[in-house]
Amino acid sequence: MTTLTTTPRADGFHMPAEWAPHSQTWMVWPERPDNWRNGGKPAQAAFTAVAKAIAQFEPVTVCVSAAQYENARARLDDDNIRLVEITTDDAWVRDTGPTFVINGRGEVRGVDWTFNAWGGFDGGLYWPWQRDDQVARKILDIEGCKRYRTEGFVLEGGSIHVDGEGTLITTEECLLNRNRNPHLSREEIEAVLREHLAIDTVIWLPEGLYNDETDGHVDNFCCYVRPGEVLLAWTDDQNDPNYPRCQAAMRVLESVRDAKGRQLIVHKMPIPGPIHASEEECAGVDAAEGSQERSPAVRLAGSYVNFLIVNGGIVAPSFDDPKDAEARAILQQVFPEHRVVMVPGREILLGGGNIHCITQQQPAPQGA
């Protein structure tokens, strides 16, 4: 499909909020043995559960390699789940897939950000990554959507959240990291976001969750639940390394105004754990040069904020944790019109993310 030389804003397109109607959700099948233990089999079971949960609400398309097609097709036995053959490096379609943008005339296009595996050769999580940098374009080709390419501007979809009304939330820890766009200032980064997402206000939280190997993606820490209201991962334990991060984020959220001039309402979501991988789980991950080492000593960045809003539903991770029930209750309270479905998230967390990280919503066309 056509690669445009204009920007979405100039063409009348914007990134809608996640709660806007979807035509489908995209996923990628996990198989990378140096990230997913036991050849990816436990992760495949977890991804299958997520896909089937989403399929209760809307269609799902799963990208899968030729080698895994037959296995994935057998597991994803649901009439609302489609498979397409795409070669990838790993399974994080939130960060490798396109950020879809829409206008009011029934058109859907996609922004294809440059991807460097969360830091390239300065702290990135694997190499090579060029096949993952092609995922967005391949998805846009399949869907027949026109493409905006930000060549040389690195961004992952998990590092941003929007309210659909002109405001974006992100973290300085990620977007201002020297391993993303060191040649650009904060103001220059904001300018790219404004032009490609049609937002007017950027809310900068200092950091994301402790030990988040993506360098503090906001989708694991703070998200919009509706215009003017956010959900923030939270701990009252002053000995938790997340405590100063939560406090710093709250200070920002309480002091800013969004693009519509509103003061934000902040809902708190408890942080599970602390969660650690077991020796057995770490031993199941293949050792490979250039890949992220797994250690039971490292606290995992577990978060209930890492959920996906779908058409009429919320698909959120559970961790076999005492806080699971409270998390479900909070989600049901802030999304009273949605049905909350909790899916075990530990296997996804062991790979470095959770449900929001492994999904990418495609908005439905709006207008005629």
From Swiss-Prot:
Keywords: Hydrolase, Polyamine biosynthesis. GO terms for molecular function: agmatine deiminase activity; protein-arginine deiminase activity. It is an enzyme of class 3 (hydrolase). Gene3D superfamilies: L-arginine/glycine Amidinotransferase, Chain A (3.75.10.10). It comes from the Bacteria. Coiled coil: none annotated. Its EC number is 3.5.3.12. Pathway: Amine and polyamine biosynthesis; putrescine biosynthesis via agmatine pathway; N-carbamoylputrescine from agmatine: step 1/1. The active site is at C357 (amidino-cysteine intermediate). One of its GO terms (biological process) is putrescine biosynthetic process from arginine. It catalyses: agmatine + H2O = N-carbamoylputrescine + NH4(+). InterPro entries: Agmatine_deiminase, Peptidyl-Arg-deiminase_porph. Belongs to the agmatine deiminase family. Homodimer. Mediates the hydrolysis of agmatine into N-carbamoylputrescine in the arginine decarboxylase (ADC) pathway of putrescine biosynthesis, a basic polyamine. This is Agmatine deiminase. It comes from Ectopseudomonas mendocina (strain ymp).
